[in-house]
């Protein structure tokens, strides 16, 4: 198994470490790579788009040539997980986006950028998961908000109280929060099971 973390901006090393730990817990052979160039996509079984700043990530993905190949691979069934800004990158509709911003538009959700306010308004809270009874501590940092599910294909994956904060659509997972900033690898393990 080969997992690529888009390594252009954001919390890349944390996702790499969390994915390595999840691979070990699942007792799978595998490697995790720092994706910076399109030629590195050869042989990749799954991709993670980390948090950071969505405008910067979008611009850098286009500049490095990663944008179009990743979009095509995801449309063809490649498992992808986007967290925080990564969720914005995956979303079909983005409120508060500028006209020049370009998104992958592969996940049937409408999101609102920075819906929780500035970095000082960041918080941690227990999140309920669809696949596990034990709460997960969600780290929300200038997080986007999922405001609408746009098709029946989108299934809620995580809730903060009664509000959906994580979704799954076939091969795609999108999360408002940062699972890589905890020592809990359950979400990364769940994602990796899409590959095996």
UniProtKB/Swiss-Prot annotation:
Pfam families the UniProt entry points to: SNO
HAMAP family: PdxT
Active-site residues per Swiss-Prot or TrEMBL entry: 84 (nucleophile), 178 (charge relay system), 180 (charge relay system)
Intrachain S-S bonds: none
PANTHER family attached to this UniProt entry: PYRIDOXAL 5'-PHOSPHATE SYNTHASE SUBUNIT SNO, PYRIDOXAL 5'-PHOSPHATE SYNTHASE SUBUNIT SNO1-RELATED
Source species, domain of life: Archaea
Phylogenetic classification of the source organism: Archaea, Methanobacteriati, Methanobacteriota, Thermococci, Thermococcales
Key words, A-Z: Glutamine amidotransferase, Hydrolase, Lyase, Pyridoxal phosphate
Protein name as it appears in the record: Pyridoxal 5'-phosphate synthase subunit PdxT
GO cellular component: cytosol; glutaminase complex
GO molecular function, one term: glutaminase activity
Oligomer status and interactors: In the presence of PdxS, forms a dodecamer of heterodimers. Only shows activity in the heterodimer.
